[in-house]
Amino acid sequence: MQYLPIFTKLDNKPVLVVGGGDVALRKCSALLKARASITLVAPKFCQQLIELASENKVTLIHEYFSEQHLKNMMLVIAATDLEHVNSQVFELANAHNIFVNVVDDQPKCTFIFPSIVDRNPITIAISSAGTAPVLARRLREKLETLIPQHIGPLATLVGGFRSKVKQRFKHFADRRQFWEGVFDSSVVSKVQTGDTQAAEQQLEHMLNAKAEPEGEVYVVGAGPGDPELLTLKALQLMQQADVVVYDYLVSDEIMELVRRDADLICVGKRLGDHSVAQQDTNQMLVDLAKQGKKVCRIKGGDPFIYGRGGEEVQVLAANKVNYQIVPGITAAAGCSAYAGIPLTHRDHAQAIQFVTGHCKKDGQELDWQSLAKPNQTLAIYMGVIKSPHIQAELLKHGRNANTPVAIIENGTRKNQRVITGKLGELADLITRNSVVSPALLIIGEVASLHQELHWFGAKAQTSSFAQPLTDVA
């Protein structure tokens, strides 16, 4: 280990920065976060540093560097583009036993700046000992995606309870067990959702009584299939869950990202094949949460867009089960983007309607008159089986038979397939190409842009019709 990682409290401590340009400005930004007392010395300064001085955030000395500037300094940073000046700063600081950093010159550093993940008061520092700063930055970027923003407020909250916990539990092992229970409880999720008052109340309760484990359900949208389209929050909750309840629409690649030791429960959901009835799924979520489990109810797309997430959350709320809702990229947005089809376009579509082809058996019929209007895009979920009916009703209510359509099968996934054609042949396209779910139907002029804007996967299989279809509008 070339450098000992330590954290230094610089609050009002004197720090010298030699230099007056952009590099010096960057170093000042980090030092100001630590509330250091910063003095800069240089013959001239950039405008941003002059503005900081006018706000009394830094002190500027318009002089060339000399040994006298080192007096009483705790740290020194050389941030000039003059090698001989940087060397002079290093040698004199070393002679006075002052820690010194020469920017981008690792051999002339007795301390270095790490890459930082800041979740105040939690701070994570990553260093390559000056050998590969770009690699250290990339590691920081990875950690930024994995460490949620609420970690900082959580640390602040529990920090306020440390003395109470020490009074309550005299032995270290007991205190450690208590804190493990806190971080496994819904105190964390309450902070995450911004309800710090409820989190504090629960902490007080846990401190004064032996609380039963409190379960919670995360209703998570997994997006259309590509695991890189998951939100950070979805990934974090997937990796916290004790139990994962999922549908067939959730891709295998996404399921690979759940916590390794979590129990996996598949509840089906294909047309005509509901391996678990919806009401049974609802009750299962309640029962698991009442057992103190953290349950991730993961759904393809967005849970509140044709995912029956609203029904499940209603049951959770009625049973007073804690829950969180994590939106996902809905199929219409994700699949159309991966097919190079903008859902709206100034020249083609000023409106969009999301439609399901799988309504309740006794449900109200769709407003076909509205759906058949021109200059709009229809994004139809679960419409493969009902495509003959969809086609017939749109034509019957005046939509042009030559209206472009696109069928996106397994959108955003490695096996994505796009089939394009005209509304008048929609059902035939699906039959001839043996389209299977999950598939999204896009109906509207924007579907014609696929060939021009294609970027992912194979280009569309186009209609075999050489001539435009007869306008039956």
Swiss-Prot record:
Positions of region (Uroporphyrinogen-III C-methyltransferase): 215-473
CDD domains to which the protein is assigned, alphabetical: SUMT
Pathway: Cofactor biosynthesis; adenosylcobalamin biosynthesis; precorrin-2 from uroporphyrinogen III: step 1/1; Cofactor biosynthesis; adenosylcobalamin biosynthesis; sirohydrochlorin from precorrin-2: step 1/1; Porphyrin-containing compound metabolism; siroheme biosynthesis; precorrin-2 from uroporphyrinogen III: step 1/1; Porphyrin-containing compound metabolism; siroheme biosynthesis; siroheme from sirohydrochlorin: step 1/1
Name of a matching Pfam family: NAD_binding_7
Keyword S-adenosyl-L-methionine: yes
GO MF, one example: precorrin-2 dehydrogenase activity
Chain positions covered by the region annotation Precorrin-2 dehydrogenase /sirohydrochlorin ferrochelatase: 1-203
Catalytic activity entry: uroporphyrinogen III + 2 S-adenosyl-L-methionine = precorrin-2 + 2 S-adenosyl-L-homocysteine + H(+); precorrin-2 + NAD(+) = sirohydrochlorin + NADH + 2 H(+); siroheme + 2 H(+) = sirohydrochlorin + Fe(2+)
S-S pairs: none
Modified residues (Phosphoserine): 128
Name the UniProt record assigns to this protein: Siroheme synthase
